[in-house]
Each structure stands twice: as C-alpha cells, then as structure tokens.
C-alpha cells in the first residue's frame, strides 16, 4: 500500500472523543507491568489445594494462556483491515490491544512458573474438543479471512467470534470461576490481582468489538443479520466447552455446578444482542462517540462484584 497522506496531520487533528481513541487513552492510563504482581504467596496456597482442585485449576489456566497466545498471533489481520478502511484511531487502539494480549500471555506464564507448574500442559486441552474447535479453527479462520476480505461483513464475523463469544462469554466465565476459587477460599492473591488487571484490559477489548459491530450495523442493516447468524452459530459451541470441562470430572471441586456457569455464559452472550441491535438505523457520527459498549462491560463487572461480595 502506497502512503499518500498522514491522518494525524489533518485539519482539526484526531478526534480524541471517538470510541477507539477513548479506549486507547484508557489503556495508557491503566498501564500495568506483570513483573509488579506479587506471586510469592500463591505457591503455598496452590499446594494447599487438593489434587483434584489443582487439576481443575490447571486446566482452567491452560485454556486462558493458550487463548491469550492464540489472539496475540491471530489479531494482526484486524489491524490491516482498519488500515485498509483508513481508520487510524482503530489501528492505534489495536496495536495496544495486541500488546495487552501478549502481556496476558506473559503474566499467566509467570504465574504458572511461580506455582511450579513447569511440565508440558498441552494435555489439559486434549480432552476439550469444543475449546480446540473454537481456538484452533474458528478464531484463526475468522481473523485470517480479513487478510483477503476486510469487508464490514467479514469484520463483524471476526468480532463476533473473538470479542463477543471468546472474550464476551468464554473468558468472562473463566474469570468468574477464578474469582469464585480465590474469593471463596481466600487464596491466591497474585492470581486475584492478575485476573483483575486482565479483566480491566479485556473490558476495553470487548467494548471495541461492540463498537465495531455497531458502526457496521448502523452503516448497513444487512450486517445485523451477519452478527446474529455468527453469534447463533458459536454460542452453542461456547456452552459446549463448559459441558466438556465438567464431563471430565466425576467429582466437581470448589462447590461448582455446571448449571451456574452455563447460565452465566449464556446471559453474557444473549445480552450482547441488544447492544448491537440498538445501533440499527443510527447515524454513524452518533455511534463514534457513544460509549454504551464500555458501559455494558462495566455493568457486567459491577454485577460480578456484587455476587462475589455476597459469597465472600
């Protein structure tokens, strides 16, 4: 691609109130370094768990770190799609997005090292067919498609896959599980801090995905059907991952119940439809400075905090 101009030099400069640059500024303001998290108490807490509890938690962590690594590798075509569309603000935000995914991979690996889990953990994903289909097939296929087809419809499919189903259902459910483990047992303070930091980053990621789908739906109502179809295709797969995880254990640790996590994941997925559909027929200029996508993620976080405070 030949460069003919620089958007940062345009009259009026950049629109710092636009959603992508608002998220970019937020990420800068909330920067954190994995090396600053204290994991010193987590090793003793980890060893105090039963073998069954450690096995469950290791499988949960394996899903997280493999997912963070996958997105670090797969997200680049979305940046190229933003460049092709001439959206510098989105491109700036996605550079931060990719950096944060790499940082999340780093911090989960640091935690595993700190608690002594240094063996090959790939086997913890072998018995999770829905997880492997989502991360080994659906995610890379939907994002790699943008390299040859950066169209709005392809962007909506990619965002629905990653931002709305993987982050917006599967990851949120996993964070909820970690919070339940740590808060109920009052253990693993390093993991608690790790999840808090990552969760804050990923609320911005999900908000960007919602914003992206909303602007495409506002521009062309046909993209609403694209979003709806992709979500309806992948939500059952996300819920199947919970089934797969629970089916591996005759005895379920931590007092967990499959129905609780299925309901949690389904609720987060279904509530995303309303936020996207509310953009139908809206002016694009309104969508660009509408912060409701971020407000939705903050609402989810506040709800979780109330539930966990009650159970503590």
Swiss-Prot record:
There is a cross-link at residues 71-162 (3-(O4'-tyrosyl)-valine (Val-Tyr)). It comes from the Bacteria. Its cofactor is Fe cation; Mn(2+). The keyword Manganese applies. Probable oxidase that might be involved in lipid metabolism. NCBIfam families: PRK08326.1-2, PRK08326.1-3, PRK08326.1-4. Fe cation binds at residues 101, 167, 202, 205. Belongs to the ribonucleoside diphosphate reductase small chain family. R2-like ligand binding oxidase subfamily. Keywords: Iron, Manganese, Metal-binding, Oxidoreductase. Homodimer. InterPro entries: Ferritin-like_SF, R2LOX, RNR-like, RNR_small_fam. One of its GO terms (biological process) is deoxyribonucleotide biosynthetic process. This is R2-like ligand binding oxidase. Its EC number is 1.-.-.-. Binds 1 Fe cation per subunit. Mn(2+) binds at residues 68, 101, 104. GO terms for molecular function: metal ion binding; oxidoreductase activity.
């Amino acid at each position: 691609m030949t460069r003919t101009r620089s958007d940062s030099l345009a009259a009026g400069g950049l629109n710092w109130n636009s959603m992508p640059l608002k998220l970019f500024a937020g990420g800068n303001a909330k920067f954190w370094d994995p090396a600053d998290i204290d994991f010193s108490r987590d090793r003793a807490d980890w060893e105090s768990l039963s073998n069954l509890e450690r096995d469950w938690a290791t499988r949960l962590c394996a899903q997280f770190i493999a997912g963070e690594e996958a997105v670090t590798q797969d997200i680049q075509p979305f940046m190229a799609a933003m460049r092709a569309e001439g959206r510098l603000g989105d491109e700036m935000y996605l550079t931060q997005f990719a950096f944060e995914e790499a940082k999340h991979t780093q911090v989960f690996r640091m935690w595993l090292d700190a608690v002594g889990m240094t063996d090959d953990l790939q086997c913890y994903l072998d018995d999770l067919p829905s997880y492997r289909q989502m991360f080994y097939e659906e995610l890379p296929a939907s994002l790699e498609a943008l390299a040859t087809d950066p169209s709005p419809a392809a962007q909506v499919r990619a965002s629905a896959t990653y931002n709305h189903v993987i982050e917006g259902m599967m990851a949120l459910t996993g964070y909820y599980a970690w919070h339940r483990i740590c808060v109920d047992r009052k253990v693993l303070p390093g993991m608690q801090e790790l999840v808090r930091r990552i969760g804050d980053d990923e609320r911005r990621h999900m908000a960007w995905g919602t914003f992206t789908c909303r602007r495409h739906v506002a521009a062309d109502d046909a993209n609403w059907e694209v979003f709806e179809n992709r979500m309806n295709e992948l939500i059952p797969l996300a819920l199947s991952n919970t089934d797969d995880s629970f089916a591996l254990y005759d005895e379920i640790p931590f007092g967990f119940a499959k129905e609780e996590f299925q309901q949690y994941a389904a609720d987060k997925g279904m509530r995303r439809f309303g936020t996207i559909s509310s953009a139908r027929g809206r002016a694009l200029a309104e969508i660009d400075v509408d912060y409701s996508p971020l407000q939705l993620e903050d609402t989810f976080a506040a709800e979780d905090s109330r539930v966990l405070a009650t159970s503590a």
